[in-house]
Amino acid sequence: YLLIKRNGLWDLPKGHREKGEDFTVTALREVREETGVDNLELGGLICITDHCYYRDDIWHLKHIWWYDMLYNEPVDLVPQKEEDITKAAWVAKSGLPPLLKNTFPSILEVFHEAKV
């Protein structure tokens, strides 16, 4: 599993959709931008989560479309520092439990929906 560490919490790569951009294109682009991983094969939709956050004196509602993705080529991970991502890591299923104690509820929901 490909995880990122942002603001001290483990997370999954994600981001904002550009105007008119297909959700699948957004998913692949954001993973590439946040981790340096390219040439991914998109799998099926896992789930859609919603969460609210407060920024610039405004509450925002964010809908996130989560997809399975596969990769075939080894790649050096490059965390996107300008997005406050301090680490990107491949994590085996057996290594997930301690990391998932330090994440967001929506990420736990994604792993639950993915049957991990």
Label each residue range with its predicted role.
Residues 98-116:
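Charged phosphate-binding loop/patch that engages nucleotide di/tri-phosphates or the phosphate backbone
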Residues 17-44, 48-103:
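Unchanged
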Residues 9, 55-61, 112-116:
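Proteins with a high burden of low-complexity, intrinsically disordered sequence enriched in S/T/G/P/A and R
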Residues 1-13:
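N-terminal strand-loop-strand
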